[in-house]
Swiss-Prot record:
Gene3D superfamilies: 2.40.50.100, 2.40.50.150, 3.90.1100.10, DNA-directed RNA polymerase, subunit 2, domain 6 (2.40.270.10), RNA polymerase alpha subunit dimerisation domain (3.90.1800.10), RNA polymerase Rpb2, domain 2 (3.90.1110.10). One of its GO terms (molecular function) is DNA binding. The keyword Phosphoprotein does not apply. The keyword Transferase applies. GO terms for biological process: DNA-templated transcription. This is DNA-directed RNA polymerase subunit beta. The gene is rpoB. It comes from Alkaliphilus oremlandii (strain OhILAs).
């Protein structure tokens, strides 16, 4: 098949796709934006309505929340917020009304309720200057869940859980003796009949009448010791509140607050929907035979005759006629009674449209009947419905729900009803930003409510105003805590546009109210058939979070209940035509349907070509179905996978494990200096770049009026107004990569609204460009490809093909100390002019200076503590005036192993009116940019999970070359392909070779791209052999290699794991306080761990002296290491090692256990172990980096805080809690690091 051209932005790609796109892909970050918008429009209102009105205990004062508004113009815009380390937020103002019932006085005031963080256009929040993302959480949906277990004899035991959104759980279980018991709110279990009696069905006869005679019910009644409603209430009260005196009144009010108080028990919209779905009569009698005539209660008409099988339409008709109990024949031909929860479809009973009443379709029939019996006029009915909306679809559980759930439990034993799969996406829902925020806001408001009630009782009634009663601290604190430290509020992964996009579409099962890593078993993590088209089966992290953190599929969306929906094309069964009508289905709805795949061939009219079609049948089974039975068809082959996975060409030819690595590694690619869009793309590149928010889009149609490297001005067509677009230049991302935008339009060019006018990081002509197209060959070369190592051409280094810019931020702050303020100055003690050459008169480095490690960035001095003066000195001081105050140098210096060019300086000071943390007078930030060329030790990868480390950079003249003299750019190991089964990379290389020489850019979409024949045809067109192999020559000898080699273009990424960030060496440095051993890790400037097994190795070789010095003078023999240093400096012989500090610690530990431990010589005389360092260490100062260890008599050891130069005070800042990997929260990050000992803390 010949590819056809497709226009993507400014680029034309040759597409191999055969399936027409019926539905455009939705905006990929709408998920976040829509949810936040819902919160501002409706979510906030719901919370205020729930809390309002607040009454005091006497019922005299009433506080109502009338209205709220968010100020449109925040104090700082997005840029300023990032620069000043503040939160991008707008003030929330609430109109509050206070009513005094006795005097009838009404006071109304607008109350400021704190600053509310705003979402940026790209779906992120800026909290304390850092961009953060709130990820979506997957939680168990509220509802009624039934499960089955088998006892030792193989008998089925059913159990059930009734889960609300918030409130007490109800759990039913059947034991081997057929007794059904209930647990209320996780307390001890009791017979289920006790609960029924407490709900008003007091006698045995009433209960049997209610549920029908069932052997389980009779067994339970036998076990039940209570006989009346009052006894049952007391029995429940004793179990729930042991130790409190039980009274019937208390018991009643306890049950009322537990289940029937909307403030305590909330099903939420989704809970009511799930309850009605599970417990409705219609679903339970469907397909069963009626055991008695079913009669319409209002007309007396027989709806179903005895012995008739009930179909779907009849079952719904029976339910909507208000019938709530039906006798049916079970599978075992017993007659059983089925009880629903008495909800009906309101539209069947009311002739007019009720949309504007905002009542849900399903309503509680007894209340509806009462309204219809009382009123006959439409207006009256409308008003009554409005007034009793809360009773019609109650937010809390009602008695009918409880009885229906118990009836279901009894019916299950007779094979009536289904058990639930809790990993099914119909039973898991997504909580997005809006809902998470709403929950947090609700917590804050309920805390505030308590405060308001207390203040109402204390304050003078006449003087009370809304402002005086309301304390906004709890609300502000709840919001701040959520954004600052919730597990779901994560530091945005800003490596490249794709990683930003994916982060916003992440679904996490962890977090508050979710699962924990330890408890999650295999089932929760596994791919489920309901994930199809909703959650990507490929993209998930490797490691402890596998399967718990997922990504939304490309076309999926979240509905109002939080369930994930996937779009399908409707099949018109009458005509047998696949229409272009799109319907979104949840996993529940899909389970009952027959769905064809997107690549099923259709003719011109949209009819299926084949008579028998491979489909997904009921409950996810794959089977062949006749064409006339198909209900829906997939929209696109891409709908199964996520955005990152859809960017892997030939995904269908890769093993799933490697595809997972490929999808994850694309997110780790560093933006390169010279971007290069892939020759072999999938057609997803344009949309993902556009939606990620890193490129600039034109807001209106117009003409480019003027443009420079940092601004584009467009003259609008409509009204001639000018739109200005500011471009970001060399800004630092969260991960230290470089954000730089550049225009891709020219003056006078016409643009349409939504066109890309400027490229961002990792984009090229509006397409995502994460790496570079490299000419590669699959062959071995002198063992340099062993174990996936990569051999590269020096040309890539020289031409900056794989060079990236990295920007680091360093800050110095001048604080107030006890001895006086610190000062930022150029006047630093004991520093030569050479070191100050790049500092300006303030002592701050100039922009453009080139710095190496150890150079001063910001000169700063701190007052030194002065000793107590003697009387004579004080007298002299008084006569001759103040001697210069003693200060020490605490300048900010470039840390070890870092260097680069200063690209930006920011100075904030109190005097200029900047907001600074308490105790800070001045804050200076310096930004150092580094150009990092590709280097030995850097990690590179393709898009198919084929990763490796660069082992050697070879001169171009030594690289293998093609017949025309072109040297290869990269040599990869052919052995990396077969065992890994990622054949996609080979196809990519073949097609890349052909496309490059034909001058094509190719789009080969996943599951709908080029096949082997297409690739061979393309190779033939380009004049290559159909095998795709070519003759290669050795660059050193010029001889041809024995065999032909696969050569072509592969898209290679340079990953974030760069050798410059990892390589590290230490001379002398900080030591741990207790054990006196060197710290570990690059951040602490630590040493190399010499562990137990390394000691064995030296012991095995008998290297006694080496071993002794490693365990003593190179580690924790405090005196010995100082003396050794001294001897090396003076050129003397190294002294005998002393006793290691850890040995002394061990002895102390044993002594603390009351063991008298002594060290004896061979002659049994005791060896005295000195407690502290004696004066014989002399005066010595060890310098390393920017920390000076002065040993004046006793050795003073200073421990640096992580990357903090100010050794005097160790301040903990918020950044210390920032985790670089959004999937590890900070407490675990420290547990996972392999520190030498706990004392490093």
């Amino acid at each position: 098949m010949m590819p056809h051209p497709v226009q993507l932005g400014k680029k034309t790609r040759m597409s191999y796709s055969q399936i027409d796109e019926v539905l455009e892909m939705p905006n990929l970050i709408d998920l976040q934006k829509d949810s936040y918008q819902w919160f501002l429009d409706e979510g906030l209102k719901e919370v205020f309505d729930d809390v309002s009105p607040i009454e005091d205990y006497t019922g005299n004062l009433i506080l109502e929340f009338v209205d709220y508004s968010l100020d449109e113009n925040p104090k700082y815009n997005i840029e300023d917020s990032k620069e000043r380390d503040v939160t991008y937020a707008a003030p929330l103002k609430v109109k509050v009304r206070l009513i005094n019932k006795t005097t009838g006085e009404v006071k109304e005031q607008e109350v400021f309720m704190g600053d509310f963080p705003l979402m940026t256009d790209t779906g992120t929040f800026i909290i304390n200057g850092a961009e953060r993302v709130i990820v979506n959480q997957l939680v168990r949906s509220p509802g009624v869940y039934y499960s089955r277990e088998f006892d030792k004899t193989g008998k089925q035991l059913f159990s059930a859980t009734v889960i609300p959104n918030r409130g007490a759980w109800l759990e039913y279980e059947t034991d081997s003796n057929d007794i059904v018991s209930v647990r209320i709110d996780r307390t001890r279990k009791q017979p289920v009949t006790v609960l029924l009696r407490a709900l008003g069905y007091g006698s045995d006869a009433q209960i049997k009448e209610l549920l029908g005679e069932d052997e389980r019910l009779l067994a339970t009644l036998e076990k039940d010791s209570t006989k009346t409603t009052d006894e049952a209430l007391l029995e429940i009260y004793k179990k729930l509140r042991p130790g409190e005196p039980p009274t019937v009144e208390n018991a009643k009010s306890l049950l009322r607050t537990l289940f029937f108080d909307p403030k305590r028990y909330d099903l939420a919209k989704v809970g009511r929907y799930k309850f009605n779905k599970k417990l409705s009569l219609a679903n339970r009698i469907l397909g069963k035979k009626a055991a008695a005539n079913i009669v319409d209660p209002s007309t007396g008409e027989i709806l179903v005759e005895e012995g008739t099988k009930i179909d779907r339409e009849t079952s719904i008709m029976v339910q909507d006629s208000g019938i709530n109990e039906v006798f049916i024949y079970a599978e075992d031909n017993k007659v059983i009674k089925v009880l629903g929860n008495h909800f009906v479809n309101i539209n069947k009973h009311i002739p007019f449209n009720i949309e504007e009443l905002k009542i849900s379709d399903k309503v509680y029939y007894p209340v509806l009947k009462e309204i219809l019996d009382t009123f006959s006029q439409e207006e009256d009915i409308r008003d009554a419905l409005k007034e009793r909306a809360k009773e019609l679809s109650p937010k809390h559980i009602i008695i009918a729900d409880i009885i229906a759930s118990i009836s279901y439990e009894f019916n299950l034993a007779h094979d009536t009803g289904n058990i639930d799969d809790i990993d099914h996406l119909g039973n898991r829902r997504s909580r997005s930003v809006g809902e998470l925020l709403q929950n947090q806001f609700r917590i804050g408001l309920s805390r505030m409510e308590r405060v308001v009630k207390e203040r109402m009782t204390i304050q003078d009634v006449d003087l009370a105003t809304p402002q005086a009663l309301i304390n906004i601290r709890p609300v502000a604190a709840a919001i701040k805590e959520f954004f600052g430290s919730s597990q779901l509020s994560q530091f945005m992964d800003q490596n490249n546009p794709l990683s930003e996009l994916t982060h916003k579409r992440r679904l996490s099962a962890l977090g508050p109210g979710g699962l924990s890593r330890e408890r999650a078993g295999f089932e929760v993590r596994d791919v489920h058939n309901s994930h199809y088209g909703r959650m990507c089966p490929i993209e998930t992290p490797e490691g402890p979070n596998i399967g718990l953190i997922n990504t939304l599929s490309t076309y999926a969306r979240v509905n109002e209940y939080g369930f994930i929906e996937s779009p399908y094309r409707k099949v018109d069964k009458k005509r047998g035509v696949v229409t272009n009508v799109i319907e979104y289905l949840t996993a529940d709805e899909e389970d009952l349907l027959v769905i064809a795949q997107a690549n099923e061939p259709l003719d011109e009219e949209g009819r299926f070509v084949n008579k028998r079609i491979a489909c997904r049948m009921q409950f996810g089974a794959i089977d062949i179905a006749p064409a006339n039975e198909v209900d829906y068809m997939d929209v696109s082959p891409k709908q199964v996978v996520s955005v990152a996975t859809a960017m892997i060409p030939f995904l269908e030819n890769d093993d799933a494990n490697r595809a997972l690595m490929g999808a994850n590694m694309q997110r780790q690619a560093v933006p390169l200096l010279i971007t290069d869009a892939p020759i072999i793309g999938t057609g997803m590149e344009y949309q993902s770049a556009k939606d990620s928010g890193v490129v600039i889009l034109a807001k209106h149609d117009g003409v480019i009026d003027r443009l420079s490297s940092n601004e584009i001005v467009i003259k609008r067509d409509k009204d001639g107004q000018k739109d200005r677009y500011k471009l970001l230049k060399f800004k630092r991302s969260n991960q230290g990569t470089c954000i730089n935008q550049r225009p891709i339009v020219s003056k006078g060019e016409r643009v349409k609204a939504g066109d890309v006018i400027a490229d961002g990081p990792s984009t090229n002509q509006g397409e995502i460009a994460l790496g570079r197209n490299c000419l590669i060959g699959f062959m071995t070369w002198e063992g340099y490809n062993y174990e996936d190592a990569i051999l590269i051409n020096e040309k890539l280094v020289k031409e900056d093909s794989l060079t990236s810019i990295h920007i680091e931020e360093y800050e110095a702050e001048a604080r107030d100390t006890k001895l006086g303020p610190e000062e930022i100055t150029r006047d630093i003690p004991n520093v030569g002019e050479e070191a100050l050459k790049d500092l300006d008169e303030r002592g701050i480095i100039r922009i453009g200076a080139e710095v190496q490690s150890g150079d001063i960035l910001v000169g700063k001095v701190t007052p030194k503590g002065e000793t107590e003066l003697t009387a004579e000195e004080r007298l002299l001081r008084a006569i001759f005036g103040e001697k210069a105050r003693e200060v020490r140098d605490t300048s900010l210096k470039v840390p070890h192993g870092e260097s680069g060019i200063i690209v930006d300086i920011k100075v904030f000071s109190r005097e200029n009116g900047d907001e600074l943390p308490p105790g800070v007078n001045e804050l200076v930030r310096a930004y150092i940019a580094q150009k990092r060329k590709i280097n030995v030790g850097d990690k590179m990868a393709g898009r198919h999970g084929n990763k490796g480390v660069i082992s050697r950079v070879l001169p171009a003249e030594d690289m293998p070359f093609l017949a025309d003299g072109t040297p290869l750019e990269i040599v990869l190991n052919p052995l990396g392909v077969p065992s890994r089964m990622n054949i996609g990379q080979v196809l990519e290389v073949h097609l890349g070779l052909a496309a490059k020489s034909l001058g094509w850019n190719v789009a080969t979409p996943v599951f709908d791209g080029a096949n082997e024949h297409d690739i061979m045809d393309a190779l033939e067109m380009a004049g290559f052999s159909r095998s795709g192999k070519v003759k290669l020559y050795d660059g050193r000898t010029g001889e041809p290699f024995d065999n032909d080699v696969t050569v072509g273009y592969m898209y290679m990424l340079k990953l974030h794991h760069l050798v410059d960030d990892k390589i590290h060496a230490r001379s002398t440095g900080p030591y741990s306080l207790v054990t006196q051993q060197p710290l570990g890790g690059k951040a602490q400037f630590g040493g190399q761990r010499f562990g137990e097994m390394e000691v064995w190795a030296l012991e095995a070789y008998g290297a006694a002296h080496t071993l002794q010095e490693i365990l003593t003078v190179k580690s924790d023999d405090v005196v010995g290491r100082v003396k050794t240093y001294e001897c090396i400096v003076k050129g003397e012989n190294i002294p005998e090692p002393g006793v290691p500090e850890s040995f002394k610690v061990l002895i102390k530990e044993l002594q603390s256990l009351c063991l008298d431990v002594k060290v004896l010589t061979e002659e049994d005389s005791e060896i005295e172990i000195k407690e502290s360092v004696e004066d014989d260490s002399g005066e010595l100062s060890i310098e390393y980096g920017d920390l000076t260890y002065e040993a004046d008599g006793e050795l003073e050891i200073i421990e640096p805080a992580e990357e903090e130069q100010d050794t005097d005070v160790d301040y903990i800042t918020e950044d210390d809690f920032e985790s670089p990997d959004p999937e590890i929260d900070f407490d675990e990050k420290y547990l996972e690091d392999d520190f030498n000992s706990y004392d490093d803390f």
